[in-house]
Design a protein with these regions (language model features):
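Helicase-core coupling region on the C-terminal RecA-like lobe
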Residues: 1-68, 125-126, 159, 164-191
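Conserved helicase motor "Helicase C" RecA-like lobe of SF1/SF2 P-loop NTPases
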Residues: 67-116
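Conserved C-terminal motor-coupling region of P-loop helicases
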Residues: 100, 108, 136-148, 179-187
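A short beta-strand element within the Helicase C-terminal
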Residues: 117, 121-137, 154, 162-166
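Conserved SF2 helicase motif VI
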Residues: 143-163
Length: 191
């Protein structure tokens, strides 16, 4: 909550007391960026209605989601009803993720705890754990919808306990907001 508070609200936004110090794993950081720059992932344009998709990034997100579920423990997730949100600014990415989750038998016990939606579809909602797929990966540094920082404010403030962002820093670092967000996350990881 500290970064969005500083960037969007002049430091005046504070987490609610009941979630301020709440975490899932004692040794875990509350926010993590998985940089896909070295992975040679590429976005694809699939049309005006659905926008862009980055299948390799989506597949990595699902792999990281499974790892995180195993770290927390499946029985704990089910007992405590730890819920997960998966957010992307692009409808094509959301649809791809929904289809992959539906087809993955290992995720079946947790499906009722997953919400997969666009940033706009997530407005007003929160989840214990949020994964964000930023999709954009191109040499030109074009970021499209990601230029709309109001949407990014919504996306990065949906997590009650853990936020995981997947994105290509090489593409995003040309924009001040993403550069500062990445620096903030790296500083947390170094503490």
């Amino acid at each position: 909550m500290k970064f969005p508070s500083q960037w969007f609200y002049n430091g005046e936004l504070e987490a609610a007391p009941e979630v301020r110090y709440r975490g899932i794993l004692d040794w875990d950081t509350p926010i993590h960026w998985i940089d896909t720059s070295e992975m040679d992932f590429k976005e694809e344009f699939v049309g005006e209605t659905f926008g862009r998709i980055n299948k390799a990034e989506a597949d990595l997100l699902l792999s990281e989601l499974k790892i995180y579920i195993n770290r927390i423990g499946g029985s704990r997730i089910l007992e405590e009803k730890i819920d997960f949100g998966i957010i992307s600014p692009y409808k094509a990415q959301v649809q791809y993720l929904r289809n992959k989750i539906k087809a993955d038998a290992s995720l079946k016990p947790y499906r009722s705890l997953f919400t997969v939606n666009t940033v706009d579809g997530f407005q007003g909602q929160e989840r214990d754990v949020i994964f964000i797929s930023l999709v954009r990966a191109n040499e030109e540094g074009q970021i499209g919808f990601l230029n709309d920082l109001r949407r990014m404010n919504v996306a990065i403030t949906r997590a009650r306990m853990k936020l995981v962002i997947l994105g290509e820093a090489e593409t995003l670092k040309h924009h001040g907001f993403y550069r500062k967000l990445l620096e903030f996350i790296q500083n947390i990881g170094n503490q």
